[in-house]
Regions:
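Short, conserved DNA-binding cores of transcription-related domains
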Residues: 1-95
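Short, positively charged, Gly/Tyr-enriched micro-motifs
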Residues: 2-4, 8-19, 85-169
C-alpha cells in the first residue's frame, strides 16, 4: 500500500468519526477512541511501508549484491507503541566462505535476532510493569499479538542484564 492510500484511509476514518460524533455529540469518548484508533492504524501501516521500502533499497543496492545473495523475503511483525507493524524483511546469505545468514534490515535498524518489540514499545511495557503488574503491562500496547506475562518477564530480565553489564561493580 502506498502513502497516498494510507492517507486516504486515515482521512476517511477521521471523517467517519466526526460524522458519528455529530449524530451523538454527547458521546465524545467514542470520537476520542475512533481518532486514536485511526491514527494508530495509520502510523503502524506507515512504519510498515517505510521499513518495506528500506528493505527494497537494501535488496537493490549494488554493494549488497557484491557481498550477499538473497535467500528469501519474509513477512515480519514488529510490536510497536502504535500497533503491529507488518513489513517485508529479506534474509541474506554472505557470499564469503563462512556463508553466514542475516536480515540486513534488522541489523540496520538495531533489532536483535527474533526481537518482537520496538525499543519504544519495550520501554512502555517495562515502565507499566514497574508501576502495576506484568498482566496489566501486556495491555498497554495497541497490539493484536498476544503478549504473555512470561514474554514480558523475559524482556525485563534481559534489560536488567544489559543494565548490570553497563554498570559493573
Amino acid at each position: 500500500m502506498d502513502i497516498v492510500a494510507l492517507l486516504e484511509d486515515l482521512v476517511k476514518g477521521l471523517l467517519d468519526a466526526e460524522d458519528k460524533f455529530f449524530e451523538n455529540p454527547k458521546d465524545f469518548s467514542s470520537l476520542e477512541r475512533s481518532i486514536k484508533s485511526s491514527t494508530e492504524s495509520f502510523s503502524a501501516a506507515f512504519l510498515g511501508v517505510v521499513l518495506s521500502r528500506m528493505n527494497s533499497i537494501l535488496s537493490e543496492c549494488g554493494a549488497r549484491k557484491e557481498r550477499f545473495n538473497i535467500q528469501r523475503v519474509d513477512k515480519r511483525i514488529l510490536i510497536t507503541s502504535v500497533g503491529d507493524v507488518v513489513f517485508d524483511c529479506t534474509y541474506f546469505k554472505r557470499k564469503s566462505r563462512e556463508g553466514s545468514h542475516s536480515y540486513l534490515l534488522e541489523e540496520l535498524i538495531g533489532l536483535a535476532y527474533h526481537e518482537r518489540f520496538s525499543e519504544e514499545a519495550e520501554v512502555m511495557l517495562l515502565t507499566e510493569a514497574l508501576k502495576t503488574s506484568y498482566r496489566e503491562a501486556t495491555k498497554v500496547l495497541p497490539s493484536k499479538q498476544r503478549i504473555s506475562k512470561t514474554t514480558l518477564r523475559n524482556s525485563m530480565a534481559r534489560s536488567l542484564r544489559i543494565i548490570r553489564a553497563s554498570f559493573p561493580n
